[in-house]
């Protein structure tokens, strides 16, 4: 196994230079963006799930800028964020415009910190994204807490934090966090109660031959609570039938949408992939916002897509397509190619015979214009 992987890696390295020079020629010296670098990432056996998410995040500019800024801060004890900032800095400061980098330090740290990723099985890109964002937020909050205790920054809201157990938001929250409001209306007394909950990404169900807008409408469809699922109404002081729906109250700077393409099939006793065709537009506006939403008319542009290739969650491959300036690129581990915007349609999914292998959008990253 190790010998085969080594041979495969050597063969791959032999083609890297050719791919890099071809990409540089295709973009052209005059069109090549200033201070931009396009570097593939070496796959360490099963790390395409990680590589694809890292490439998508690198081209979410607000996130990249914060990670690079973190690199310039006083040196800290090694953690997942220091390893990520080292990787991003290594890409951003390369003398060459295109090439390949091995994210070995980051992968080693990831496997050390979480046993879920410490093996050579295929992992879920969405699980990794969730873990990475939450871990970075935890690191930043812990560092801020330590700085307050050491007196390096003013106490600010430290008493407030201790009382409410709600730490100050980090730049991860500033970039990715939105707020959902869960509205429940009692059908007896018409009283509406609402409860807010924050999210870093939204997971939406998928159906055949639909669009992201349709999926989001389905996410916010009104649900009737009846029979054994009746709602306890505080006004009526008893269980009543009610209508329930989820709407977006605060729209994030970057909206990460996870398409729930893996479904457990009882008859098969395993998860299977839903390769349904789901159209995701280059521009998006959310229509499932609450009445008191901030910036309900906010427009989003698609900046990155993590694509799953294959027929199931535990096998297959992940790639990323990203928008950089005015063109699109496909990152397939160490291979980087320029693609036409029209080619994105190839990643919507299949219209028929959905049991076939497919290359279908799995995580979408939309960045707001304001």
UniProtKB/Swiss-Prot annotation:
Region spans: Disordered: 145-168
Residue ranges annotated for the USP domain, each copy included: 39-369
Keyword S-adenosyl-L-methionine applies: no
One GO cellular component term noted in the UniProt record for this chain: nucleus
Disulfide topology: none
Enzyme's top EC category: hydrolase
InterPro entries referenced in this protein's UniProt entry, alphabetically: Papain-like_cys_pep_sf, Peptidase_C19, Peptidase_C19_UCH, USP_CS, USP_dom
Chain sites annotated for binding Zn(2+): 186, 189, 233, 236
Record keywords, A-Z: Hydrolase, Metal-binding, Protease, Thiol protease, Ubl conjugation pathway, Zinc
Biological-process GO terms, alphabetical: protein deubiquitination; proteolysis; regulation of protein stability
EC number(s) on file: 3.4.19.12
Compositional bias per record (Low complexity), positions renumbered to this chain: 155-165
Gene Ontology molecular function terms on file: cysteine-type deubiquitinase activity; cysteine-type endopeptidase activity; metal ion binding
Reaction it catalyzes: Thiol-dependent hydrolysis of ester, thioester, amide, peptide and isopeptide bonds formed by the C-terminal Gly of ubiquitin (a 76-residue protein attached to proteins as an intracellular targeting signal)
Pfam families: UCH
Protein name: Ubiquitin carboxyl-terminal hydrolase 12-B
């Amino acid at each position: 196994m190790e010998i085969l992987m080594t041979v495969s890696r050597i063969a791959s390295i032999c083609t890297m230079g050719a791919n890099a020079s071809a990409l540089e020629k295709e973009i052209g010296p005059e069109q090549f963006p200033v201070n931009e670098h396009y570097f593939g990432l070496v796959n360490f056996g099963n790390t395409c799930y990680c590589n694809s998410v890292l490439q998508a995040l690198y081209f979410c500019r607000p996130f990249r800028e914060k990670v690079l800024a973190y690199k310039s801060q006083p040196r800290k004890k090694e953690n997942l964020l220091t390893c990520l900032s080292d990787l991003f800095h290594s890409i951003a400061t390369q003398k060459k415009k295109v090439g390949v980098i091995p994210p070995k330090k980051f992968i080693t740290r990831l496997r050390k910190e979480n046993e879920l990723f410490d093996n050579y099985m295929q992992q879920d890109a969405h699980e990794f994204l969730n873990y990475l964002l939450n871990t970075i937020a935890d690191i930043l909050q812990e560092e801020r807490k330590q700085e307050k205790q050491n007196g390096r920054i003013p106490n600010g809201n430290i008493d407030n934090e201790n009382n409410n157990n709600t730490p100050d938001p980090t730049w991860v929250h500033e970039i990715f966090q939105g707020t959902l409001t869960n509205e429940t209306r009692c059908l007896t007394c018409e009283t509406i109660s609402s409860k807010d909950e924050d999210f870093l990404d939204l997971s939406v169900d998928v159906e055949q031959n639909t669009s992201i807008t349709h999926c989001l409408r389905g996410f916010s469809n009104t649900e009737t609570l009846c029979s054994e699922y009746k709602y306890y109404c505080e006004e009526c002081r008893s269980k009543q039938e009610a209508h329930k729906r989820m709407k977006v109250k605060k729209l994030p700077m970057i909206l990460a949408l996870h398409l729930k393409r893996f479904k457990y099939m009882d008859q098969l006793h395993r998860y299977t992939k839903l390769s349904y065709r789901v159209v995701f537009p280059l521009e998006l506006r959310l229509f499932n916002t609450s009445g008191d939403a901030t910036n309900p008319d906010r427009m989003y542009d698609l900046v990155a897509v993590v694509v799953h290739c294959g027929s199931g969650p535990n096998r297959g491959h992940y790639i990323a397509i990203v928008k950089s300036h005015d063109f699109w690129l496909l990152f397939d581990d160490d291979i980087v190619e320029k693609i036409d915007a029209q080619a994105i349609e190839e990643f919507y999914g299949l219209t028929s015979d959905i049991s076939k292998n497919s290359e279908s959008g799995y995580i979408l990253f939309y960045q707001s214009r304001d």
